[in-house]
Amino acid sequence: MTMRLPPLPTIGELIRLFGLSAKQQLSQNFLLDLNITDKIVRSSGDLTNKTVIEVGPGPGGLTRSILKAGAKKLVVIEKDRRFLPALEVLRHAAGNIDGSPWEEAFLTKSEMDAKRYMSYAPNKSRMQIVMNDVLRVDEQEILQHIHAPIDSNDKTQWENMAPITIIGNLPFAISTELTIKWLKQIQGRHGAFRFGRAEFILMFQKEVADRLIANPGTKQYSRLTVMTQQLCSVKKLSDIPGSAFVPKPDVDASLVSMVPRVTPLGVNVPTPTLEYVCRQVFGQRRKMINNSVKTLGPEAEILLARAHIDPTLRPEQLTVPQWCDLARAYQQWENKPQWAPAL
């Protein structure tokens, strides 16, 4: 699909366009090098028949590369209204799905809430903008106007990959919270996953990416590791130096692919239960687990026997299936303390 996209603004132009100081404006660490953004999009494979959800497009560096790659449909989710002018220019250039000229398809959050937005926006527009906090957005509300949902009880439908890819240079401050939101959606097969197994191509702080791919027994192995690997196959695609971002952050970043598993590792326990058990027990990761597990309540050592876990292991040595077994034992524990949260 051929189109003419405007050039990326310089840093000075960004500051003038949005009327902000460099320190305030650039705290979001933009990727403005099209060689890098093109490489990220190539990692996503063929997008010509896919809907892409881009998280946090900012001024549109990665957005441009997604459009250039020929994505059939692009929905960008952006919280900061200061980026609207840049994104609207891109939407105008993108036109409609059928190649016809663009028509108005944007409504501000002040005009309608996120749930109403998509019912007003013409579906034929190739690029659509959702002005909202991605932590609060229900992707199902967006995608139901584009794709038909699968039967969540039909294993065969879940085995097939959805024609949806989620791409984003995630704000470091919310990357863990956002990942957990998506994991809960994967398990419940709602949100974007109401339509099948959608792949993620995401930029994380390198430290977080290393936790996502970690193995048992390493210092990076953590609660986030267990929760993510239970439900997704995770692979690091590349490391990207901090110098590639504007402004340069104090840390490097990594590009990660996450693909929902057809069948979860270990027993399938509710994500909130697994999260709670991991959070409590990983808090004492260097102690033997027969001591660490006591953070779940008095006499919680019985859970180790029920889960067939060696009590002399340390939390960081448990495999993902073993963590799932422990969470299931906790879920079924008849003597959970009264102060335990409802999960």
Curated annotation (Swiss-Prot):
S-adenosyl-L-methionine binds at residues 28-31, 56, 78, 133, 169. Transmembrane segments: none annotated. GO terms for cellular component: mitochondrial matrix. It holds the Pfam family RrnaAD. It is found in: Mitochondrion. Keywords: Methyltransferase, Mitochondrion, RNA-binding, rRNA processing, S-adenosyl-L-methionine, Transcription, Transcription regulation, Transferase, Transit peptide. PROSITE patterns: RRNA_A_DIMETH, SAM_RNA_A_N6_MT. It is an enzyme of class 2 (transferase). Its EC number is 2.1.1.-. GO terms for biological process: transcription initiation at mitochondrial promoter. GO terms for molecular function: mitochondrial transcription factor activity; RNA binding; rRNA (adenine-N6,N6-)-dimethyltransferase activity. Belongs to the class I-like SAM-binding methyltransferase superfamily. rRNA adenine N(6)-methyltransferase family. KsgA subfamily. Probable S-adenosyl-L-methionine-dependent methyltransferase which specifically dimethylates mitochondrial 12S rRNA at the conserved stem loop. Also required for basal transcription of mitochondrial DNA. Stimulates transcription independently of the methyltransferase activity. This is Dimethyladenosine transferase 1, mitochondrial.
